[in-house]
Regions:
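N-terminal Lys/Arg-rich, disordered targeting/topogenic segments
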Residues: 1-7
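Low-complexity, Ser/Thr/Pro/Gly-rich disordered linker/stalk regions
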Residues: 8-277
């Protein structure tokens, strides 16, 4: 038979173990609370890429190309601003996923869809950014050999998203439609996957992507992807830069297939928004 002192000791030990468990849970929740929430809830007010001119009318292809800056691929041929009944915005960007015509660009044979860069005033230098937009992949969308969606860029911008001189982090889809995050930095290419579900098709899907640059010499850069508010992919050990002078500059507006498109198709993207710090 245990003495009262032994019972008291057992109770105290049990209480201590329970207390440690509670403290551990609180610490875990505190560490994971931020990353579980979409990044738009934790960043300053976002800057939007407008699809309208000064008169409030949808941009023409020529005006869109002018807003795209000095370098673009496929904007005139494959991009247009269209009305979207029931979508997340009144007007959205429609991208035809077709090969660029011969002569459209010296790299036309290797590209489809569109690509350009947008740098909001005041963004550079930034070491963290949150990009958000919605995308509509048609019902029975052919994922082909994989493809890519708009992401974040920085560093020294090259002429294409595959440039060895640049830094980019973008959502992509695999052959089977599963999402992944692809990063390119100084010629290094990394991919983060693991989600078992394919990108939803036939409806609008909300995307939020967070990129946090690592301190030079340390591999703890962060890339996270939320799909319809659910954290889908997350990594906190990504080497995104080696030089403190490499910072985030804006949105890499790129959408298309890797390789030749499997069939004539298109997708739609709502006006994208980015915030930074």
């Amino acid at each position: 038979m245990k003495s009262p002192r032994q019972f008291e000791l057992l109770i105290n030990v049990g209480a201590a173990i329970a207390g440690i468990g509670v403290i551990g849970y609180i610490a875990y929740a505190a560490l994971h609370k931020d990353v579980d929430q979409p990044c738009s809830t934790r960043y300053p007010a976002a800057t939007r890429f407008s699809l309208h001119n000064s008169e409030g009318k949808p941009l023409s292809a020529i005006a869109l190309q002018a807003r795209a800056g000095l370098r673009d691929l496929g904007v005139i041929d494959n991009a247009s601003v269209v009305r979207s009944a029931g979508g997340p915005a009144e007007d959205v960007l429609e991208v035809k996923l077709r090969q660029l015509p011969a002569g459209a660009d010296q790299d036309a044979a290797a590209h489809n869809g569109i690509e350009f860069r947008w740098s909001p005033p005041g963004m550079k230098p930034a070491t963290a950014a949150c990009l958000s937009y919605s995308v509509l992949l048609p019902d029975k969308f052919a994922f082909g050999s994989g493809g890519f969606l708009p992401g974040v860029f920085g560093g020294t911008a090259g002429l294409s998203r595959d440039s060895a001189a640049g830094l980019s982090v973008s959502p992509e889809w695999e052959r089977d439609g599963r999402p992944l995050i692809a990063s390119t930095s100084a010629g290094r290419i990394g991919r983060i996957s693991g989600n078992k579900s394919a990108w939803p098709t036939g409806r609008w899907v909300r995307i939020e992507q967070e990129v946090v640059l690592n301190e030079p010499g340390k591999e703890y850069g962060q890339t996270s992807l939320w799909v319809d508010g659910v954290l889908t992919l997350d990594s906190r050990s990504v080497l995104l830069r080696k030089d403190a002078g490499e910072t985030l500059s804006g949105v890499l507006v790129a959408a298309g297939y890797h390789g030749t498109p499997p069939e004539a198709s298109s997708l739609r993207i709502s006006p994208f928004e980015i915030s930074w710090r």
